Structure formats: C-alpha cells, structure tokens
C-alpha cells in the first residue's frame, strides 16, 4: 500500500516568522494540498537555550493569520527527547556513536596540525580525534561516525517516494532534490563526524529531525535552500537507524538588501500579518506563482491549482 503524502513545516521558536520562513511554510502547505496529503507543524525547540518563551504561540498565530492550518495538533521537540535518546542509544550499541571530549579550540588545533585548518560554512570538519577513545579526558558530547557506511545500492525510501534516486557509494551520499536536481556530498571529508548530543545535554537538530520525520511518517520534506546542506547527514542517519528517506524539495531563499539570506540571526523583520494576503503574495512570487487578489482562502486555492513542483 502506497503511503499517503505527509509534509511538515518545522519552525524554531527563536523569533517570529519572517518573509523567508513564510516562503517555506507556504511551499510545504501547497505541496501537501496539491498531493491531497496532510500538512503538520512541528515546533523545533530542541535547542532550548536559543528559544524565546511564548514565541511558539506567536508563530502559530502568524500561520493561522495566513490561512495555513495544520491537519493535526502541533508537536514540540522538547517533549520528545526520550525518542532522541533511544535513537542515540541504538547508535551507541551499534558502534556508530562515540563520546567526544573536544572543544572547538581542540578541533581547530588538531586541524591546524594536519594542515587542514579550514571551516565549511562556519563549521569545522571534525578530524575524528576521539574515535579511538577519550584517552583520559571527559566526554563533552556524542558524535556520529560517518565513515562506516559502505552500502552501494539503492537506499530504503518511504513507499510514496520510491522514484527518488538515493545512493551511498564509497561514503559519498547521492540524492535528488525535487528542485535542485542531482546532489552529492562526501560527509566524512566535507563534514566529519558530527554531533548528535551536545555538551549541555541538548540533542542536535540533525538527530531530532530524522527521528521526528520517521515517527510522523513524513514522506516529503519541503524547506528552505539554506537547509539543503543538511540533507546528506540526515540521509546517513536515516540509513544507520534503519529509517526511510523521504523526498526533499528545497525552496528559493529570500535575500536582504545586500544579498544576504534573511534570517533571525541577521535581524530579519518579523512577518507582518496585518495584511496576510500581501505577505502571502510576496512569498508566492518567490515561488514563481502569480499574485492574487481577493481573499486569502481564494488565493491559496488558486496557488494549489498552479503548484507543479
């Protein structure tokens, strides 16, 4: 039996939605409706130190003002940490996760000694210092071994998405994005063993999103292009955990006046929902859809008909 389409929008309550996040929300909602599927909302508050109290309610109100209503009650990652611990425990038992004692300075020093002192999108490529043990130091975090997956055949996908082309060959992960086309990444070389649980006890986005997508039966992930770089890590985690890989569609970014990506970190203005149709029309144009007049409901219906991603 073919799985029903299930999509999701997963905002972090570190600030209100802005114009860029509405693009991802609208695209994921339209994709679900165009496929006669379900659209879920998940509040990604696993990074608790960065979350702002009450911001989850603000985000849900912004979505509602724009006519974007979930088909099930929202879920909060902060209430699901037991699931993430179970997944981490499974990886530890399999020898795929290990404790790490390294600070950022330790990693920079190790990379410098190797002549590889380089950062990728601000991230340091972890050199595997603690793979062989802590050597008397105290573990600060848990990392995933990225160099052990050798399968060279099509990967398991959700039944709905069997046409997706996914492959892991010689540690290089290949996948097809519905908008960006063929993609690949050598995770061990370009990312290194990445963190699953931080020194402060918080689980990372990579582990939480993989566990939640599987638990909620997500068939299609529609999100901003700034998150495309995470896809290979998530596919690797899915396969390590024996979870299906959904299809991925990464939407265009909204850029600021100087060409920078709009984000909460660089002070993007909160989404103004006093005129929701104006906000939605701006998001629709980014997605290549025509502007609509009239009601919000009428515009959403027209865009569902026009959606062909």
From Swiss-Prot:
Q: Which UniProt keywords apply?
A: Aminoacyl-tRNA synthetase, ATP-binding, Ligase, Metal-binding, Nucleotide-binding, Zinc
* UniProt cross-references to Pfam families, sorted A to Z: tRNA-synt_1c (PF00749)
The residue numbers the entry assigns to motif 'KMSKS' region are 261-265
Per the record, the GO terms for biological process are: glutamyl-tRNA aminoacylation; tRNA modification
Any one cellular-component term (Gene Ontology): cytosol
Gene3D superfamilies per the UniProt record, alphabetical:
HUPs
> Motif 'HIGH' region: residue span?
11-21
The answer to whether keyword Flavoprotein applies is no
User: What's an example of a GO molecular-function annotation for this chain?
Assistant: zinc ion binding
Cofactor, how bound (note): Binds 1 zinc ion per subunit.
Q: Which residues bind ATP?
A: 264
Report the EC code(s) recorded for this entry: 6.1.1.-
Q: Which InterPro entries match?
A: Glu-Q_tRNA(Asp)_Synthase, Glu/Gln-tRNA-synth, Glu/Gln-tRNA-synth_Ib_cat-dom, GluQ/Sye, Rossmann-like_a/b/a_fold
Cofactor dependence is on:
Zn(2+)
Binding residues for Zn(2+), per the UniProt record?
Answer: 100, 102, 126, 130
Look at the named UniProt entry and state the broad enzyme category this protein falls under: ligase
Annotated L-glutamate binding lies at 8-12, 44, 205, 223
Family membership: Belongs to the class-I aminoacyl-tRNA synthetase family. GluQ subfamily.
What this protein is reported to do is described as: Catalyzes the tRNA-independent activation of glutamate in presence of ATP and the subsequent transfer of glutamate onto a tRNA(Asp). Glutamate is transferred on the 2-amino-5-(4,5-dihydroxy-2-cyclopenten-1-yl) moiety of the queuosine in the wobble position of the QUC anticodon.
Known HAMAP family for this protein?
A: Glu_Q_tRNA_synth
Kindly give the PANTHER family that the UniProt entry links to this protein: GLUTAMATE--TRNA LIGASE (PTHR43311), GLUTAMYL-Q TRNA(ASP) SYNTHETASE (PTHR43311:SF1)
Q: What is the designated name of this protein?
A: Glutamyl-Q tRNA(Asp) synthetase
Source organism per UniProt: Albidiferax ferrireducens (strain ATCC BAA-621 / DSM 15236 / T118) (Rhodoferax ferrireducens)
The uppermost taxa in this organism's lineage are: Bacteria, Pseudomonadati, Pseudomonadota, Betaproteobacteria, Burkholderiales
